[in-house]
Amino acid sequence: MSYDCDILIKNGAIVDGTGSAPYKGAVAVKDERIVAVGKVEGDLTKGADTVIDAEGMAVTPGFIDVHNHGDMTILYYPQADGYLRQGITTFVGGNCGSSPAPFEDEVSLGMGLYDLYYDLSPDMYYPTTLVDRDAFNEKHREMFGWEVNWRTMGDFMKEVEGRGLSPNYVPLLGHHPIRHVVMSHDFKRHATPEEVEEMKVHVRRAMEDGCRGMSVGRDYEPSYWASFDELVALASVVSEYGGVYTCHSLRTGLRKARRPGEFPPVKVEGLKEALNVGREAKISVEISHLGTLFDVTPMGDKDLAEAATKATLKLVDDAIADGVPVGFDLIPNVRGFGTSSNNWLISRLLPWLKVAGSREQLGRALRMKEFREEIKEVIWSGKYYSLNPNITPTWAQGTRIMESKEPAFVDKTIAQIAEERGIDPLDALMDVIVADPDAKTGSMGRQSPTKYMFYQHPSSMIGVDTYAIDTSYVTKNPAWSRPSENSFGGFAAYFRDVVREGKILSLEDAVKKVTSTSAAKFGLKDRGVLKAGAYADIVVMDLETVAPRATPLNPCLYPEGIEHVFVNGGHVVKDSEHTGARPGKVLRRE
């Protein structure tokens, strides 16, 4: 049979996204859609302007990232180079309770605009991101040349479409802006029944505008302060539209000051809460970046770790048995802090870095004994969440020096340096910074020895938990943070670690998780599969070479092995380079 097509991808191993075994064949594309997929090429080349010989490569549906914050930066990085060049053709934005709307006279657009917020309202410990719209826009005009004028999710979607984007964007509504727009700064309490009713109006409007669900971030303000009844009430509105309730469950507790003697919540209770929202609201649930939620002591005991993971997954399975559609997502590489890598060691002392104004100046100041003692007093008080030995007593064991002008420190943890010198770990940290304020570190990682059990669960999916950016992104006030490695190579790490090297999943099962399983979860029709009539979101990948090139020292490197990427039939990545094409769409609720 002859097919009129624009693009022909031939001789590849077709991995169609359904879980079926790969086979050698071809894919033909006309305009936005796939017109043929088959074992025999035949006359598919008729009219094809682009012919790709995929001999020795896998041809898969485009990858769908189900846990992402790309909506907060897509207007600033519309090509989303970091996503497309690792094969992400569709991202689900609006996670962890944050979305770009609704807002009225105050706006909050997340930590992707950290420099702007810091200029407007300098902070020492915790940034203020809910600010007056006029003041925000004055600074925004100065930095970017345009203003933020949208107020609703519908308006924001139109803004994104008007500017164009390379990937597809699946919008979720965040719980944070709903609470902000109704309660403003008076959010550290349960909402009144009248306030909940007002929130429901905003939820309904967002769902009518095309959102595919609502997210909450229970470890962050203002979601942290919501009652269970509020969550159920809002999720019930989302359920009316067939939407998804995505939940960063309560695990750490509020990520702000934690005084000595104040204990974090029992992590598993946060998962139970999310699943119970699903039961009460009769809604599909997505658990964000799930991990083992039972603490194991001593660490490293494989049998105990497996038992804890089984107990965590049993809660998921029990909810599924009760009729709740439950999925969960995993971050491929868990080094760093979600959206950022913070590989300058000095970032551990960020409040004092801000005061000093530069890494060099803080390095000099740390030579003062009195200054050190003041810093240690604050740290031990629990005022600074990100370095709090009261809640993370093993922090020094997990911080390894990877680069320093002082060779004696390289490839040692802060704990090892402290032991060698017979000093407190905090003093060891400061000694390393004094020796080289530009010293680089890499987290030892939090990769669970039982993560394979999560990958093998049929409800698991993948999300890189990062912003849509390119290699130019860095904070400037002062420079202390860089993007996460996952911003550039998370999916490449997934296929290397889970398929080629780890052999945890077969290629077809690994592909299914990030394509048809993810599409089904969020109701993406004709996405996530290679079949006639489906949208032409396609990745051509060399499974023998696919791997991240990003490292803790240099996270801003694109991966190897992702050769070609198509979005809605547009050739966005060609020979591993972004073409500049912007064929992406906002995938509204249908």
Label every model-predicted segment.
Residues 57, 76-212, 242-243, 324:
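Divalent-metal coordination cores built from histidine and acidic residues
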Residues 62-71:
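Metallo-beta-lactamase
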Residues 156-160, 165-185, 190-193, 199-221, ...:
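Active-site neighborhoods of metal-dependent hydrolases
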Residues 2-8, 14-62, 77, 548:
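Histidine-rich, glycine-flanked metal-binding segment
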Residues 14-26, 440-451, 502-511, 519-556:
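Acidic, glycine-enriched loop/beta-strand segments at the rims
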Residues 208-270:
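Divalent metal-binding pocket/active-site signature
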Residues 12, 27, 32, 56, ...:
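Divalent metal-coordination and catalytic microenvironments
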Residues 12, 368, 453-459, 464-472, ...:
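C-terminal cap of metal-dependent C-N hydrolases
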